[in-house]
Each structure stands twice: as structure tokens, then as C-alpha cells.
Regions:
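N-terminal leader/targeting and assembly helices and adjacent pre-domain segments
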Residues: 1-161, 248-274
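Acidic, glycine-rich two-metal-ion catalytic cores of nucleic acid-processing enzymes
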Residues: 164-260
Length: 274
């Protein structure tokens, strides 16, 4: 594994552990909402244990869902902001160290961090995407709860539906963290390359594993000028990176993720056709 690939790999590994904290935030919100909805259903049941849709009931449910997800949105944003700032700093510092830059870029880096974290993709920045995901989940759960009540489902069936909805959204949140982190780490490394005075080109490096997409696989091993380099991430959960090319450097080894071993350098296409 190239030193610059390892920087991203190490950051990804550290973040994978932190994502467990994000899952706990989802579990906390899920359990709170389950308790609130159970209390609302119990309060609105008639003597026969039946519950019917009414305006006060829908208001109570909507109010509980809105409050839960407002708090969850704030928690998720704080978590993601911390992950992205740490990811940028680590990628910037380690990349600068590997290239041999020793200047104090503290003031410049603050400007770089703010720009990198808030940069939009397709017109939306990370806070927009967090809000969109949380809002979609809130609406889906609200509608699913009402559908369960309309169809006469028991409270345990309603609870299962809420848990299922949270499970899907937790995966989407983890994917968003990985995708945004890939973007910020790439921004940090490109900031170092562009300001180094020694890096003029980069090499696209994909991952040697069977689920690497054709787009990334086709670009693997290709050289690009700094100002014509592909944007990373190429897609959600992208694990590619850009390696600096200095003087006559050529890669000699790389990691084979399918076997967890180091091999003599070959491109993804060559690896796939072996």
C-alpha cells in the first residue's frame, strides 16, 4: 500500500469505529420515539383496546416525531462536522509530512477546512444532505405509524416498523459519513499537492477488490494534471484516492484487498483479468 493510500485507509479505519457512536445516536432516538409512541397509543386506546385516527392523535404523533428528529438532526450534524474536521486535519498533516513540507500552514488550513467541509455536491452540502435524510425518515415513520393504526396493527407491529425504518436510515447515514469523508480527505490532500510547489500530477488509485466499479477501475493507474484530476468521491462509499507524482516516480507495489496482501504493482484492469 502506497503511503498516501495508507493515509486514507487509516482515516477510514478510525472513522469506522466512530460510526458506532453514530449508530448509538440513532438507537437513542429510536428508543425515545418508541417510548413516546407507545404512550400516545395507550392514551388513545378505547376500552376494547382499539385505536382510531383522529386529529388530536395525528397531532400528538406528528409533534413527537418532529421533536425526536429535530434533536437527532442536531446530533448527527455535530457528529459529522467533528469527523470531517478531524479527517481533513489528519489527511492534511500526514500528507504534508510525507511530501516533506514543514511550514506552518495553520492560518491557511482553517480557511481550507471551512471551504472543504461546506463545499456543495450537485448543489447540496453535507448539512443539506443530513437534513434531507432525517426529514425523509421523519415523514416515512409518521406515515408508517398512521398506516399501521389504520390497518389495525398491534403496538408490537408498529414498533417493528419504526425499528425497520431506523435501520434503513442508519445505513444511509453511515454511507453519507463515508462519502463526505472521502471528499474532504481528497480536498485536504489536493490542497497540499497544489501548494507544495513540487507536485504537478496525480495518479488515480482504485481499490483492488471485486466490488470496485467499472468507472473507478477504468481510471485506476491513469495520470492527471492537478487541475484536471477527477473529483473524489466518484460515487457513494467511494474508497479511491489520488497519489502525488513527483519527478519520475512510478508505483512498485500496492495492496490487494481481496487477499489482504501486498503485490507487485498492476492496474485494476490487469488485476481483474488475471
Amino acid at each position: 500500500m502506497n503511503d498516501f493510500e495508507k493515509i486514507k485507509y487509516d482515516i477510514d479505519e478510525a472513522t469506522a469505529k466512530k460510526i458506532k457512536k453514530l449508530i448509538k445516536l440513532f438507537k437513542k432516538s429510536q428508543d425515545k420515539l418508541l417510548g413516546d409512541i407507545a404512550a400516545i397509543i395507550l392514551e388513545n386506546m378505547d376500552d376494547d383496546g382499539a385505536i382510531f385516527i383522529s386529529e388530536p392523535l395525528t397531532f400528538q404523533i406528528r409533534n413527537s416525531v418532529t421533536k425526536t428528529f429535530s434533536e437527532m438532526n442536531a446530533d448527527e450534524l455535530a457528529f459529522l462536522n467533528e469527523v470531517l474536521e478531524n479527517g481533513y486535519n489528519e489527511a492534511f498533516n500526514q500528507t504534508a509530512k510525507k511530501i516533506g513540507i514543514t511550514a506552518d500552514w495553520e492560518l491557511v488550513r482553517k480557511e481550507f477546512i471551512a471551504r472543504a467541509i461546506s463545499a456543495p455536491i450537485n448543489g447540496k452540502n453535507y448539512s443539506d444532505r443530513v437534513w434531507e435524510n432525517v426529514n425523509d425518515l421523519a415523514n416515512r415513520i409518521y406515515n408508517d405509524i398512521l398506516d399501521c393504526i389504520r390497518t389495525g396493527k398491534r403496538p408490537n407491529a408498529i414498533a417493528k416498523q419504526i425499528k425497520d425504518d431506523f435501520g434503513v436510515s442508519a445505513y444511509q447515514a453511515a454511507r453519507l459519513v463515508n462519502t463526505e469523508l472521502a471528499r474532504v480527505v481528497n480536498e485536504a490532500q489536493m490542497d497540499v499537492y497544489k501548494n507544495s510547489g513540487v507536485v504537478e500530477k496525480v495518479m488515480f488509485s482504485a481499490t483492488l477488490e471485486n466490488n470496485t466499479c467499472d468507472i473507478c477501475g477504468d481510471m485506476d493507474g491513469k495520470y492527471y494534471s492537478l487541475h484536471n484530476a477527477p473529483k473524489i468521491p466518484v460515487h457513494p462509499n467511494c474508497r479511491c484516492c489520488l497519489i502525488p507524482v513527483v519527478d519520475d516516480w512510478k508505483p512498485t507495489q500496492r495492496a490487494d484487498d481481496s487477499t489482504k496482501t501486498k503485490i507487485d504493482y498492476i492496474t485494476f484492469k490487469e488485476w481483474k483479468n488475471k
